[in-house]
Amino acid sequence: MKIAQIAPLMESVPPRLYGGTERVVSYLTDELVHLGHDVTLFASGDSISSAKLVRCVPMALRLDANVSDPIPYYMLMLDRMRELADEFDILHFHIDQFHFPLFRLIAHRTLTTLHGRQDLHDLKALYVGFSDMPLVAISNAQRKPIANANFVGTVHHGIPVHLLKPTYNRGQYVAFLGRISPEKRPDRAIGSPGRSTFPSRSRPRSTKLMKPISAQRSRRF
């Protein structure tokens, strides 16, 4: 099967730094190649993949000091995708809903995995208007705010099983790794150790000014 994987342009695939979506796209793409599919990855030029790579921008937009607005680059990528669409059996999008208007006429050959939060009020109208676009959720909880959207399944995010091995020895602290934003609930990660015998440590990422998220000052960052 000829498959196009359309990745976000903000980070490379796989990401050099933070980039949960790009990391999942990398794992999925490489596994599809391993299974024998003919896969083409549309991503930033600094991406590394076993699939054929179409370099839509020279480098990850977040790391390009000359880029202030990513939207024009997504528009150019989607126009290129529109021209090449007939070459693929399936076009798998990982860029939210940017592509909906351009690819509606071939919706049956597209798949859109929603990697972010879907509980924003205005999204309901969008999914009603584009009810023919097939969607994949990354959890059943993600589907609840837009339960009537055109979901064809839930595929939980996963990683290759050999990457991490569990340890059953008692640790010394609870770690929070992730982006500091309301939907990630870092406040729960910081507050939970206070109800146990474990201290907490955080490795946050934030591109905006960080405001105090806890009255407790004993947390290590």
Which residues are covered by each model-predicted region?
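Catalytic cores of nucleotide-sugar-dependent glycosyltransferases that transfer UDP/GDP/TDP-activated
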Residues: 1-221
